[in-house]
Amino acid sequence: LDMGDTSVARLEKGEIEVAVLWDYNSLGYRSQIMENNPDANFEVSVPSDGAIQSGYCTIINKYTKRPYAAAVAREYIFSDEGQLNLAKGYARPIRDDVELPEDVKANLLPDDQYTNARFIEDQEAWDQAVEDLSSSWQEEVVAYAQ
């Protein structure tokens, strides 16, 4: 487990064996790697014993001179076209009534991968878990790897 620079270049070189990344980043990285090396072996999955999920956020400046521009941007993101655009970038649509073309759907992980994914409810606990993850991996996984 590498908690440092998880760039496409390092993944492609094989310097990173396991990386913990958001699904859309992982799928995008895999796409880039496969374009450069179609024989590469790069698997993306959501841990079946549990994972976290999070949504995007938007910061809207309440002092802006154009307050409706942010509203229009949000309207686009939630529109069918906006949701499709996000899915083309490997992000799962937040709306479940959006019809995705088969070629776009094929580039996303199947819904059943997210069965045990949960939202972060305690940010402080999450921050601590992230801090402890690398050492726990070394002690509890790497130490027993052969």
Language model features with spans:
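Ligand-binding pocket segment of bilobal, Venus flytrap-like solute-binding proteins
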Residues: 1-43
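Solvent-exposed, acidic/flexible segments
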Residues: 1-4, 19, 49, 66-70, ...
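Conserved C-terminal helix/tail region of periplasmic/extracytoplasmic solute-binding proteins
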Residues: 9, 111-146
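Structured segments of extracytoplasmic/periplasmic soluble domains
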Residues: 10, 14, 29-36, 63, ...
